[in-house]
């Protein structure tokens, strides 16, 4: 049987093919055409609007005859590709892998790439697809090893993902320490994004506390989640209710999946045996991911099966901490090193991945901030010795040239917590709270 164009391109590459050869003889001539782009839809050396240049940018031409071809007017690419030579080892978790993914991340966040949804890294030995949702960049596949035998199937799956993107970003809010403000974060982050016109679903998966459900003045389910996890016919959409707040000028709404009070007395071991697997909630949630822009899941402070269900359903994990809570900082490192990889190993996408931490609430003096930064530096050094690179999760703006220890801080503000008594998100009734969470959403989620 004759080789396909992808197989032929891969097979003729010399073992030490440099970046130029991989770019010309694999990416431009075979990979991008296999992904559905013709020569007028591909531009090399694309300036992304900051100081970074992508090796390739691509975008399907519009059907509007009056609009120029992407080659003629390269604007609003849908895909960027970063290429390296075969001597670059970009296998997962290598130093070169971290370097190339950071390059791609910087390119995707360029001013000329606000519409870009996809990024690819490849050296013709490996390939990985990344999804960009606003400012959030996360894996859409694992870093896959290429061979003549599998290249067609791998690229076919990548093309399918690119052509059928999920609308929603699914975020689980987690810390193994209680009292960190996960529920308050979930409510107000969802509410501020709804205010900005986004379609939002928040999920209360903390069945013992049910704080999110109660804070919004909603009624808990009585057996719905049990049925959802054990009965194939139960549709998640049937359990969703709409929270509405009527302002002076307009109303704001977002959807909620309330907690299930029956889960409190449920035998989790028996429930786990009855459910199809840890993928159960993910599969029930998946059809709704094209109906929402953002889905937020509030989970309990533990690593039991229900928390793992929510993690499996997530693209990313948001990790609130407190600067004066030693354990909340150390629990972040444990989650990134131990807990998240357990879930990533089970999924084809290699998700969820952690977003950078933030300090949630509490008044923070300069000496307290310095103490927290020093403790974080100790955590980073300790895990560095074990081969884990945690600095980007604690100090996302750190570079070799600029040792920036910035950590986003949502300050302590009594109105935010007091708003729960009124069953109204604080961002809908208080300007200061509104600005806190708007700043948070802009830094973490919106481009």
Language model features with spans:
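A short, conserved, highly charged catalytic patch centered on acidic carboxylates
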Residues: 1-118, 132-169, 363
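Short, flexible/disordered intra-domain loops and linkers
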Residues: 89-99, 219-228, 266-273, 327-331, ...
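Walker A/P-loop phosphate-binding motif and the immediately C-terminal alpha-helix
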Residues: 167-209
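Active-site signature of alpha/beta-hydrolase-fold catalytic machinery across serine-
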Residues: 188, 192, 215, 309
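Phosphate-binding loop that captures ATP/GTP phosphates
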Residues: 207-258, 396
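Cytosolic-facing regulatory segments adjacent to core modules
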Residues: 237-304
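Conserved catalytic-core segment of NTP-binding enzymes
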Residues: 290, 294-399
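C-terminal boundary of histidine-terminating zinc-finger modules
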Residues: 410-441
């Amino acid at each position: 049987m004759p080789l396909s164009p992808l197989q032929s391109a891969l097979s003729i590459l010399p073992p030490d093919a440099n970046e130029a050869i991989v770019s010309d003889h694999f990416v431009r001539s075979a990979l991008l055409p296999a992904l559905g782009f013709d020569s007028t839809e591909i531009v090399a050396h694309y300036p992304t609007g900051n100081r970074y240049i992508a090796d390739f940018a691509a975008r399907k031409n519009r059907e509007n005859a009056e609009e120029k071809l992407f080659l003629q007017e390269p604007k609003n690419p849908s895909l960027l590709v970063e290429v390296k030579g075969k001597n670059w080892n970009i296998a997962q978790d290598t130093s070169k892998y971290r370097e190339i993914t950071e390059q791609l991340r910087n390119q995707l966040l360029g001013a000329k790439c606000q519409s870009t949804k996809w990024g690819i890294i490849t050296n013709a030995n490996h390939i990985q697809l990344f999804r960009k949702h606003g400012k959030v960049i996360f894996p859409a596949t694992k870093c896959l090893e290429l061979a003549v035998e599998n290249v067609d199937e791998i690229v076919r799956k990548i093309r399918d993902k690119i052509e059928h993107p999920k609308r929603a970003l699914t975020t689980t809010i987690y810390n193994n320490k209680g009292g960190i403000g996960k529920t308050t974060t979930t409510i107000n982050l969802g509410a501020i994004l709804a205010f900005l016109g986004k379609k939002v679903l928040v999920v209360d998966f903390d069945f013992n506390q049910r704080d999110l459900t109660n804070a919004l003045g909603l009624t808990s389910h009585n057996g719905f989640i049990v049925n959802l996890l054990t009965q194939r016919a139960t549709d998640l959409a049937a359990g969703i209710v709409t929270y509405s707040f009527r302002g002076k000028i307009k109303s704001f709404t977002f959807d909620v999946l309330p907690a299930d009070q029956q889960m409190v007395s449920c035998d989790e071991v028996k429930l786990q045996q009855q459910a199809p697997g840890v993928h159960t909630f993910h599969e029930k949630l998946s059809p709704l991911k094209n109906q929402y822009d953002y889905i937020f899941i509030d989970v309990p402070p533990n690593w039991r099966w229900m928390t793992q269900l929510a993690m499996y359903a997530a693209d990313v994990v948001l990790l609130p901490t407190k600067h004066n809570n030693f354990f909340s900082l150390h629990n972040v490192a444990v989650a990134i090193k131990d807990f998240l990889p357990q879930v990533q190993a089970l999924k084809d996408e290699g998700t969820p991945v952690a977003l950078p931490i933030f300090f949630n609430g509490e008044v923070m003096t300069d000496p307290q901030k310095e103490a927290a930064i020093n403790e974080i530096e100790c955590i980073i050094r300790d895990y560095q010795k074990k081969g884990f690179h945690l600095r980007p999760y604690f100090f996302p703006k750190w570079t070799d040239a600029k040792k920036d220890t910035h950590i986003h801080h949502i300050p302590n503000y009594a109105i935010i917590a007091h708003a729960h008594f009124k069953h109204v998100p604080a961002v809908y009734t208080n300007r200061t709270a509104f600005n806190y969470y708007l700043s948070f959403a802009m830094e973490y989620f919106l481009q």
